[in-house]
């Protein structure tokens, strides 16, 4: 039986490409999988997909790949270490960006560009960026290398042009909420981080604005409570941020027991939750851009603080400062089919989409695959790390 008589040489046969992701579903997989599938089809090669935290050192030694793909080389130390080790072992290395909506922190873009990579050195042979705006940011860094940094567009957003998502009836029936014909999604924020003294995100990103953001949590809790009470005919899908752990810092804690509320965290894909709603409301959420790609209206509810270190994506949604005006916007949508304040920002949204994700044509994965194919087939390894 050939399946039981294989030697070690067969078991550890060198693979063409080894891909590492942070999880088996969600953002990282959405980023790399369309590209991997195209590479498999175009090049007729073997690609092995592995969980980053399984044992990336063992996997690189075991499979001896010609090329390693890392969905993100800066977001956590393991991603960076996998990139460095693969390069050290002579593998060609390609990295994507998990969060490419860069912003300045303390007057610098360095933290967003390099994360844990304090040496600000690109260990990869090819780094694919979301937008030309990001590449211009990179040009201000000592780590910029025109031969390595290329523009593909944000591949993780291609799905909004290529795929179909769960319909409203299917999702609502699943949770026995199918009697509702009006659906509003409330997108959660990481208030957890703002109150956690051991987490650096709050102080680093917001500085003196932090207290206003903390106060916003309690205003949102009260505002959402009033909104839910006043609209029993609307289903509010409260989508907690996936990293929220402490219920005390959850903006939805006061509405959990209402019959017109569905609390979700990681049970459903965020794009399905967006797809079934009419309006998406958030304190601050880059998910708003994804809602635009699905032709949804978005509103930002900021009752305490409106100006802080926030994504440029916020400029594409009306900022509502009190519950009365939030209610008026919702009423306007359900009576007219639109919200004028939202419609007035159409040109802003088109510019934001270009600035943030590069392209919204569903072809970012094709551009990325073309760069990787060129590296795989033609180019010598660019990054050499001596042991």
Each language-model region and where it sits:
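C-terminal amphipathic helix plus adjacent low-complexity
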Residues: 329-385
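A donor-sugar binding/catalytic signature common to diverse glycosyltransferases
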Residues: 139, 143, 266-312
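Nucleotide-activated donor-binding/catalytic signature segment of Leloir-type glycosyltransferases, i.e.
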Residues: 250-266
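Active-site and donor-binding regions of nucleotide-sugar-utilizing enzymes
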Residues: 18-163, 189, 288
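Single conserved hydrophobic/aromatic residue that forms the stacking wall/gate
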Residues: 1-12, 385-386
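Conserved catalytic-core segment of nucleotide-activated headgroup transferases in glycan assembly
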Residues: 158-252
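Nucleotide-sugar donor-binding patch of glycosyltransferase catalytic domains
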Residues: 148, 293-342
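Alpha-helix C-terminal capping/helix-to-coil transition sites in glycosyltransferase folds
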Residues: 7, 64, 123, 275-276
